[in-house]
Amino acid sequence: KINKGTALWNKDKKEIKTLKNVTINEPFFLGHFPDKPIMPGVLILESMAQSACLIILDLIENPENHLVYLSKVNNFRIYSNVIPGDQIIINAKIVHEKLNSFKFESTCHVNDKLVAKAEFLASVIKR
């Protein structure tokens, strides 16, 4: 999960910057990997998707009556490992929207170094 209360939201540009503090207490570190803990790539992607969902939920009316789901991931790349003690800065921006679908570009940085990037589609449906 991204950390609460750490989002910088620019509604005009439809972009957000969020923060994820990576601690050794994360349960996934028990098995990934016991002697060399590395944050799983799928969880880096999940933090990017959560950040993007915050944008969508702020843009739609009655967000409590909707679900946002990830419908496609393109060009997901990991450039560097994320380890306990790292602080991930996640940037997500809407680059295209049509009806109930949103295309995002997202990057993750640790200490100003690019560690991951992806493009993805998210869709909104009523509950």
Predicted features along the sequence, with ranges:
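Non-catalytic linker/capping segments at the edges of enzyme domains
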Residues: K1-I38, E64-L67, Y79-I83, V95-S101, ...
